[in-house]
Amino acid sequence: MAIKLENIKIEKSWKEVLKGEFLSPYFLEIKEKLVCLKNSGVTIYPPGNLIFNAFNLTPFDKVKVVILGQDPYHEVNQAMGLSFSVPKDVRIPPSLINIFKEINSDLGINEPNCGDLTFWAKQGVLLLNASLSVSAKIANSHKNFGWQIFTDAVIKTLSQKRENIVFMLWGNFAKAKATLIDAKKHLILTAAHPSPLAGGAFFGCKHFSKCNNFLISRGISPINWDLNYTDNQPF
């Protein structure tokens, strides 16, 4: 059975530029694998309505920055469809703590007490995981589902059809995606992964100031990385 475009709950600009992917056989296979798991009682994260959350919060023509993760968090109540992000009132994971520490060092912004990165997404930061789903308690369990074909297409489409996007690639897995990006049109920033397992090699990368300096130099409004700022905002 073919997938019907009208049944895919994703922001309309993404549906248009990615419609060839949604209608491809591999995408139907992804859907079938997820349905099979759910029918067998496996819990999948994030919830189905949040699988395309990154795309719904950051339309195709609004993307300024891409931060690439590997796969969603696999513990209960963590995954929300945004790489590195966790919902309000959920304990901030170690990698995100280190991201906040680097922002503090780089820009002097106080570390927030909340790990919800929706504020970044609404400003144009596409928080993209290479795999968009995971089975509960099993990290990277959907890496061979076909999601990476889809998200590689997302990166290539952004590279080809847009310009002046900042791609932040952290860790060897993400760095390997640089081959999908036209470095003449975009800024590619690479660093060690923010995970504590990387031994602190992420610190000092200054990606957040480099990102904003690049955007400003291209006449594009910079990202406000201060999550504390959201308390007084109407969205």
Curated annotation (Swiss-Prot):
Its EC number is 3.2.2.27. One of its GO terms (biological process) is base-excision repair, AP site formation via deaminated base removal. The keyword DNA damage applies. SMART domains: UDG, UreE_C. It catalyses: Hydrolyzes single-stranded DNA or mismatched double-stranded DNA and polynucleotides, releasing free uracil. One of its GO terms (cellular component) is cytoplasm. Belongs to the uracil-DNA glycosylase (UDG) superfamily. UNG family. It holds the Pfam family UDG. The active site is at D71. The keyword Hydrolase applies. Keywords: Cytoplasm, DNA damage, DNA repair, Hydrolase. PROSITE patterns: U_DNA_GLYCOSYLASE. Excises uracil residues from the DNA which can arise as a result of misincorporation of dUMP residues by DNA polymerase or due to deamination of cytosine. One of its GO terms (molecular function) is uracil DNA N-glycosylase activity. This is Uracil-DNA glycosylase. It comes from Campylobacter hominis (strain ATCC BAA-381 / DSM 21671 / CCUG 45161 / LMG 19568 / NCTC 13146 / CH001A). It is found in: Cytoplasm. Its main location: cytoplasm.
